[in-house]
Each structure stands twice: as structure tokens, then as C-alpha cells.
Amino acid sequence: MSGREGGKKKPLKAPKKEQSEMDEDTAAFKAKQKEQQKALEAAKQKATKGGPLLQGGIKKSGKK
């Protein structure tokens, strides 16, 4: 390579891959993940609905 050759040899962005068809195992796995995500979101909403459990915060002693 001579000093005058500049730039990158590889393109900055890789070409997009074609979306391959999913087999049954992959489809079942993705469906299971979606169900788990929905259950997690429902649990989060249920947990935040009740309000904070502790109001204490950081306890400070009387000493300095």
C-alpha cells in the first residue's frame, strides 16, 4: 500500500441480512418470551399500584 491510498477498505455499515424464516422452536421461544414480558409488565404495574412500602429513607443518629 502506498501512502496515497486513504480511506477505509470496509464499508461503515454492513449490508442488511435477509430475514430468515423461523422454525417452530424459534417461534415458540419468541412467543414464550412475549408472554413472560407481558407478565413482568403486569407485575410491575401491580407492585407500583400499592405505593411505596417504606417511608423511612436514611436513618440519621443524633450524634455528629
Swiss-Prot record:
Keywords: Coiled coil. Residues 21-50 form a coiled coil. InterPro entries: TMA7 (IPR015157). Residues 1-64 are annotated as: Disordered. Residues 32-44 have a biased composition (Basic and acidic residues). The keyword Cell membrane does not apply. PANTHER family: TRANSLATION MACHINERY-ASSOCIATED PROTEIN 7 (PTHR28632). Belongs to the TMA7 family. This is Translation machinery-associated protein 7 homolog. It comes from Anopheles gambiae (African malaria mosquito).
